[in-house]
């Protein structure tokens, strides 16, 4: 079904954009969620160096990277961040071997926490981190269960909630086209806490995340969005 051929049908696109009046585009402030897990990475690190493994080298993934770097610096401005994208083609999303190789290199260069925003490539990041005795951070959904005990947290996006809210709005008549942006203030992104990472998250770490979350909501912390100007302040 073509969206433009069905003007009386309401469509919701999650994590994508279609410019049409009968489409609601739901997108997320990944930079804000990445800021929160960056704080956790900095606080969990003993080496003073953390890592980031991106998937395809596109502005969206640079948004994750930039938010993460800002969170790390917010917690400890002396920290170093090693960052590398997996590739420049869609194959970068499904190369766990390459993800593992990048992770190994970062760990050998001092990183003891590695955040992956790389799709299926992240599975290689998580496995290598576990094998080398360092921590990893998952992405998009709660992936803490994948390597229990070595997954510090995951930067989740509440896609299910976004879908529910869109359907509920359609039912009650409040649905509208355009953009719906879910960030920290909308409880659309955050850092996952559960039984799988409970032993890794200190009270101080949790307090720091909650304080930063409140500051973002209040507007006291503004996390720069790489996609707003294709630049990162760090």
Per-range role (PLM):
Residues 4-234:
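A residue-level marker of the well-folded mature domains of exported/periplasmic proteins
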